[in-house]
Amino acid sequence: MRLILLGAPGAGKGTQAEYLSKRFSIPHISTGDILRENVKNETELGKKAKEYMDKGLLVPDEIVIEIVKDRLSKEDCKNGFLLDGFPRTIAQAEALDKVLEELGQKIDKVLNIEVPDEKILERMSGRRICKNCGASFHVIYRPPQKEGVCDVCGGELYQREDDKEETVKKRLEVYHAQTQPLIDYYKAKGLLVVAYGQEEIADTTKEVLKALGIE
């Protein structure tokens, strides 16, 4: 099975990607991870990418695509893979089609995990992290026994910048603007399937399997 996984930040994409990777014995390929790996291992592509990253610039498509191509040509991708974080644009999607054609492969399905924005906002802006031990809490779903204090070590709980309401709203706006054309692109190709994210992880997994036609 060759899958592309779409989903807004906070939609629970990472958890489902891990599950699907284990269930189907296919590698979970996160573009962020393979980019960092190439930089760390000082590969030719990694060195090129690092020049941009060091300047705080986005790594150009042609480098990202080469890195993805290199990863997809590895032995463990022969029977399938799960792509997460790529493609992000129509240009990248078209480039991916070409890469797969060269490798004699094609995408089976594009899975979009949909969660209403207000639900994501509640999930993310309610998160609190312990400054001392890193334990995670949630003001609604997993509140600490004493407000602002970690149950584990008694450390102070704080809200990460990334989880502040305004930041989350901005990230969601950017995500929708960027991803909608991609959703339309794969819908037109008849590859798009949708799973509706639920409160419980296990219920989302059921939705995901149903969307993929696996009960």
From Swiss-Prot:
Organism (species): Caldicellulosiruptor bescii (strain ATCC BAA-1888 / DSM 6725 / KCTC 15123 / Z-1320)
Keyword Lipoprotein annotated: no
EC numbers on record: 2.7.4.3
Region (LID): 126-163
Pathway: Purine metabolism; AMP biosynthesis via salvage pathway; AMP from ADP: step 1/1
Top EC class of this enzyme: transferase
Protein name (database record): Adenylate kinase
Subcellular location: Cytoplasm
Keyword flag Cytoplasm: yes
